Structures are given as C-alpha cells and as structure tokens.
C-alpha cells in the first residue's frame, strides 16, 4: 500500500500564482503584504493578482521610456536622470507621479519664450 488512496497519481509539481497569471511580479508576496498591512479584514484571491499585474505594467512602462531616454543620450545604463526625463515627458506618468521627487534626477530643460533672443530679419539683397 502506497497510502495515496485509489487514484494512485503522484502530486503535481507546485506552480506559483505568478506563473499561473503569466506575471513576473510575486503574487504571493503581494497577497501577504495586503493581509499584513491592515488595508481590509479580508483579501480576495483575485486582488493580489490584479495588483501585481498593475505594478508590473507600470514598471515596464517606466523602464521602457527610461531605456529610450538612455539610448537617446547614447548610454547603455539607466540612471536617475533618465527616469526623471522619462516620467516628466510623459503626460500621464507625470500626473501620476507629480508629488514624487527623484534623487539625482535634475530638472527638465525649459526656457521661457520671452527670454529667447529675438530673431532679427536680415536685409534682402
């Protein structure tokens, strides 16, 4: 007697909730943090999956834009300046992260139009 009952099938290999949802972010860890954080008395099974998907999407969006900013500056490594440029040049991300200060991010280059030198018209010859 093997002690496995009538079926006789071996237990399937454990599959993480992240891999089931097709995500890279940890669903189990987010679920644990939601339960621990006293956000609500109970946490549904779908809530951490949804939150992990949203966080993964936002991270991918910021990283893609920051990678483009790094490539524009002929750099192969993303630095805080590239994150700052990526976020502040994107309207929706800028609105979402308007209250966030990025250390070593610098500022966006911006010169008011009235401060620019006036265009002088050359005499026609």
Swiss-Prot record:
The keyword Nucleus applies. Keywords: Acetylation, Chromosome, DNA-binding, Methylation, Nucleosome core, Nucleus. The modification N5-methylglutamine is found at residue 104. It is found in: Nucleus; Chromosome. It holds the Pfam family Histone. Transmembrane segments: none annotated. One of its GO terms (molecular function) is structural constituent of chromatin. It comes from the Eukaryota. Residues 1-21 are annotated as: Disordered. Its main location: nucleus. The modification N-acetylserine is found at residue 2. GO terms for cellular component: nucleosome; nucleus. Residues 1-18 have a biased composition (Basic residues). Belongs to the histone H2A family. The nucleosome is a histone octamer containing two molecules each of H2A, H2B, H3 and H4 assembled in one H3-H4 heterotetramer and two H2A-H2B heterodimers. The octamer wraps approximately 147 bp of DNA. Core component of nucleosome. Nucleosomes wrap and compact DNA into chromatin, limiting DNA accessibility to the cellular machineries which require DNA as a template. Histones thereby play a central role in transcription regulation, DNA repair, DNA replication and chromosomal stability. DNA accessibility is regulated via a complex set of post-translational modifications of histones, also called histone code, and nucleosome remodeling. This is Histone H2A. It comes from Mytilus trossulus (Blue mussel).
């Amino acid at each position: 007697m093997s002690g496995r009952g009538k079926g006789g099938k071996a237990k399937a290999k454990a599959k993480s909730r992240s891999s089931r949802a097709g995500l890279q972010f940890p669903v189990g860890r987010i679920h644990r943090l939601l339960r621990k954080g006293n956000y609500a008395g109970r946490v549904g099974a779908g809530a951490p999956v949804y939150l992990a998907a949203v966080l993964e999407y936002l991270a991918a969006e910021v990283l893609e834009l920051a990678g483009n900013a790094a490539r524009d500056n002929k750099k192969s490594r993303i630095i805080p300046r590239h994150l700052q440029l990526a976020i502040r040049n994107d309207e929706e991300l800028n609105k979402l992260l308007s209250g966030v200060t990025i250390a070593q991010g610098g500022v966006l280059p911006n010169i008011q139009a009235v401060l620019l030198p006036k265009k002088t018209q050359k005499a026609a010859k």
